[in-house]
Amino acid sequence: MTDNSKIRVVVGMSGGVDSSVTALLLKEQGYDVIGVFMKNWDDTDEFGVCTATEDYKDVAAVADQIGIPYYSVNFEKEYWDRVFEYFLAEYRAGRTPNPDVMCNKEIKFKAFLGYAMTLGADYVATGHYAQVKRDENGTVHMLRGADNGKDQTYFLSQLSQEQLQKTLFPLGHLQKSEVREIAERAGLATAKKKDSTGICFIGEKNFKQFLSQYLPAQKGRMMTIDGRDMGEHAGLMYYTIGQRGGLGIGGQHGGDNQPWFVVGKDLSQNILYVGQGFYHEALMSNSLDASVIHFTREMPEEFTFECTAKFRYRQPDSQVTVHVRGDKAEVVFAEPQRAITPGQAVVFYDGKECLGGGMIDMAYKNGQPCQYI
């Protein structure tokens, strides 16, 4: 039996059930485990309760239960500078960012990893649903989590080989239901705590209200592609490509009863374009350009390959051909895709392996840019 007692693993503990079970499993496997709670946002809910304080209490309770030391570290400045400023800049540019991808890259697996090293860590571990597998050459491959509905490799797609070399994902081979069962069997304080949703580290806020605190909204016209005025929009930043709800136009306009969707944005004229039908022609594209292209293991500077890709979380994979040129790529779809959204991540897969990805800049239909920014 392997003796893990001399291997120190620092676990990022959020106060949720996933990271609690992560720490428990590592402790049971004999590792030298330390729990660390990251405070990344100065957060008070509508009742005046600082949710981070409540979460830290849960971390402390679980750490005491399983018998590990625990600490709290403050990354509010790093989060603001590296994630939140990016988040706001993307919205200013009319895009729809994915802060969770950047949060993993810059906070959980950079700032936190650096802090863990000061504690003498050999590895860090988190409660993400993903797997790491080392090949005979020592290269680490990141694989999808066994629970297809919970797989989080999409959000981990910007991690480097160096980061993956130092990372463990103890939940990767488990189903979410099994994780809950483990927590309940062990009587963990977080066993019945509901999963958090919402923006990475910001939680379940009213998004429109939250965003308006930082970016002034500029109302403008809502138009169809052929120029019909459909009323007023509340501010381009509040809408994303393919969005159905919140338009306030129902079925009263147009000759049929199909629902209305956001099909494009014109940032320079502050126009929101809408159209009827889930598969409205303006929503369909057959290629995209992406930047910040990054692979989880070493790849050539310029090459072309076929793989599958996701353009948003929880969507089925689509077959694509990727033409890589440095940190940029053209991604050509085997079948037309709906609502490709600038600012979101495109993530590449080879079977179970997540190869990496990039950020979507523009979608194209037959070589012509879609009216998305």
From Swiss-Prot:
Active-site residue numbers: C103, C200
Enzyme category, top tier: transferase
GO MF: ATP binding; tRNA binding; tRNA-uridine 2-sulfurtransferase activity
InterPro entries with a match to the protein in the record: MnmA-like, MnmA-like_C, MnmA-like_central, MnmA-like_central_sf, Rossmann-like_a/b/a_fold
Binding-site residues for ATP, renumbered to this chain: G12, M13, S14, G15, G16, V17, D18, S19, M38, G127
Assigned EC number: 2.8.1.13
GO CC terms, sorted: cytoplasm
Main location: cytoplasm
Subcellular location: Cytoplasm
NCBIfam families documented for this protein: PRK00143.1 (NF001138), trmU (TIGR00420)
Descriptive protein name: tRNA-specific 2-thiouridylase MnmA
Protein species of origin: Streptococcus pyogenes serotype M18 (strain MGAS8232)
